[in-house]
């Protein structure tokens, strides 16, 4: 009876809990993070009388995008679960003691690279990525594209008076 319990405990430690934790982390990565603990509802202005499915309102696209993808929030328990999964994976994929004369296989090299990446993720400071928005710069000598100017440059056809310079 004790052998069965020992095997069950080993199974739980090796397979069940890490996979359950990994599934919880994977499921929580797919869920949207709600900022400030409340859900923002989209304004419902469309009624049955003026709703036309073929008509698209482009002025509300930015609003829909912000409601669909709320701001990035760092949840302590979510981060803790991810770190625990990374720790489990790093211990599971730790290289075994190998003789020096043996050649390392490509699979082992991939495991070592993944292990280095996971350890870097564990030791890095956990700050969310910041989006840097840059305004587009338009040079002052820029002139708008005109079909007539393009035709005159490419085909040598000129329509209208010459430019006085």
From Swiss-Prot:
The keyword Signal applies. Keywords: Cytoplasm, Periplasm, Signal. InterPro entries: SecM. It is found in: Cytoplasm, Cytosol; Periplasm. One of its GO terms (cellular component) is periplasmic space. GO terms for molecular function: translation regulator activity. Residues 1-37 form the signal peptide. NCBIfam families: PRK02943.1-1 (NF002799). Belongs to the SecM family. Regulates secA expression by translational coupling of the secM secA operon. Translational pausing at a specific Pro residue 5 residues before the end of the protein may allow disruption of a mRNA repressor helix that normally suppresses secA translation initiation. This is Secretion monitor. It comes from Klebsiella pneumoniae subsp. pneumoniae (strain ATCC 700721 / MGH 78578).
């Amino acid at each position: 009876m004790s052998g069965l319990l020992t095997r069950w405990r080993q199974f739980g430690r090796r397979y069940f809990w890490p996979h359950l934790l990994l599934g919880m982390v994977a499921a929580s990565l797919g869920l949207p993070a709600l900022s400030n603990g409340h859900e923002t509802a989209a304004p419902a202005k469309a009624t049955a009388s003026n709703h036309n499915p073929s008509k698209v309102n482009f002025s509300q696209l930015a609003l829909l995008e912000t409601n669909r993808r709320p701001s990035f929030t760092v949840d302590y328990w979510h981060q803790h679960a991810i770190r625990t999964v990374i720790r489990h994976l790093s211990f599971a994929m730790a290289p075994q003691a190998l003789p020096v004369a043996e050649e390392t296989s490509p699979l082992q090299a991939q495991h070592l690279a993944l292990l280095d990446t996971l350890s870097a993720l564990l030791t890095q400071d956990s700050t969310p990525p910041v989006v840097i928005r840059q305004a587009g710069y338009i040079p002052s000598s820029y002139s708008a594209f005109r079909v007539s100017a393009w035709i005159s440059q490419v085909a040598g056809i000129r329509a209208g008076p010459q430019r006085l310079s």
